[in-house]
Curated annotation (Swiss-Prot):
Its EC number is 2.4.99.17. The keyword RNA-binding does not apply. GO terms for biological process: queuosine biosynthetic process; tRNA wobble guanine modification. NCBIfam families: PRK00147.1 (NF001140), queA (TIGR00113). It comes from the Bacteria. It is found in: Cytoplasm. GO terms for molecular function: S-adenosylmethionine:tRNA ribosyltransferase-isomerase activity. This is S-adenosylmethionine:tRNA ribosyltransferase-isomerase. The gene is queA. GO terms for cellular component: cytoplasm. Keywords: Cytoplasm, Queuosine biosynthesis, S-adenosyl-L-methionine, Transferase.
Length: 345
């Protein structure tokens, strides 16, 4: 089947794009897609949808204060969005300015410290931060939380907690693994009491997750790279779950991408790596049996991923249903629970 970008388009009324979180994390709705069947549930019903011995794999990345404002040596205003730290004193970043800064120039950020532009690495600027402080510490104190571009407001104090998962630990993402935002501590305790297991990995979400696909021929698209760490304990938990005949359930597309990316060249192994895996309908999943995920943007690589997981036509029906029933979309929106179809196309 030859697919183009237009195969992943849908009409979304702007008022369905959630601009703020609900009062309670688990108060969101949950659209269950199992084969051809759709079921409208609440996220609080999740314990009824999983079985003792099932394994939930969470991404414990933490969103950093990746957005900074400042000036060039000429006095021109700039906006910097850190893509990733590449050491204690260096980072790759997007820089928005009327004129791109030159290699060797200095930028004054947050009216607090200077960075040096070392050059370009692909689409990003390579920045050198002061030796006196770690990059992530400087961002924590002087940066701002980077809300997604479809949320048309600035981050506030409420977002500092609600745009993080309750289990976020490892600093490094510029966007939240949003499927995890629905879990609160009582929900995690209820799942554990039922005998549902949890495991952890880390995948740091880059700004590339918001970049649109710019080619209609999907074979020409090149995915952005994202870093992951999969502990040995998680690999062992997955093996034990499979041996017991239970399901591996990825909490979010980031967890799925890390697991499937790490299993591309053979059996899943613990370790650190990078993935640029582009998942389209026809992809054969190696590790994940079910997926918890939010609703994704039209024509996005994440919509392509979930369409590969459930089947393109079932996913189209699910999104048509979600729009028709006024589900809330994107980062602060509602969620889906999707069972993988081995015959998905």
């Amino acid at each position: 089947m030859s697919l183009t970008l237009d195969d992943f388009d849908y009409l979304l009324p702007p008022e369905l794009i959630a601009q703020a979180p609900l009062a309670e994390r688990c108060a969101s709705r949950l659209l269950v897609l199992d084969g051809e069947r759709l079921d409208d549930r609440g996220f609080c019903d999740l314990p009824e949808l999983v079985q003792p011995g099932d394994l939930l794999v969470f991404n414990d990345t933490r969103v950093i204060h990746a957005r900074l404002y400042g000036t060039k040596e000429t006095g021109g205003h700039i906006e910097v969005l850190i893509e990733r730290a590449i050491g204690p004193h260096e980072a790759l970043a997007q820089v928005r300015a009327s004129k791109s800064p030159r290699a060797g120039s200095r930028l004054r950020l947050a009216d607090a410290f200077d960075v040096t532009v070392l050059g370009r690495v692909g689409e990003f600027f390579h920045l050198r931060f002061p030796d006196s402080h770690d990059v992530l510490d400087l961002l924590e104190h002087h940066g701002k939380l980077p809300l997604p571009p479809y949320i048309d407001r600035s981050a506030d104090e409420h977002d500092e907690s609600r745009y993080q998962t309750v289990y976020a630990r490892e600093r490094g993402s510029v966007a939240a693994p949003t499927a995890g935002l629905h879990f609160d501590q009582p929900m995690l305790a209820e799942l554990a009491k039922k005998g549902v297991h949890g495991a952890w990995l880390t995948l740091h979400v880059g700004a590339g997750t918001f970049q649109p696909v710019r080619v209609n021929d999907l074979g020409e698209h090149r995915m952005h790279r994202e870093r992951y760490v999969i502990p040995q304990e998680t690999v062992a938990a997955i093996a034990a779950t499979r041996a017991a005949g239970r399901r591996v359930i990825a909490v979010g597309t980031t967890s799925l991408r890390a697991l499937e990316g790490a299993a591309q060249d053979g059996p899943l192994e613990a370790g650190t790596g990078e993935t640029e895996l582009f998942i389209l309908p026809g992809y054969r999943f190696q590790v994940v049996d079910a997926l918890i995920t939010n609703f994704h943007l039209p024509k996005s690589t994440l919509l392509m991923l979930v369409s590969a997981f459930a089947g393109l036509e079932p996913m189209r029906r699910a999104y048509t249903h979600a729009v028709g029933h006024s589900y809330r979309f994107f980062s602060y929106g509602d969620a889906m629970f999707i069972t993988h179809r081995n015959d998905a196309i």
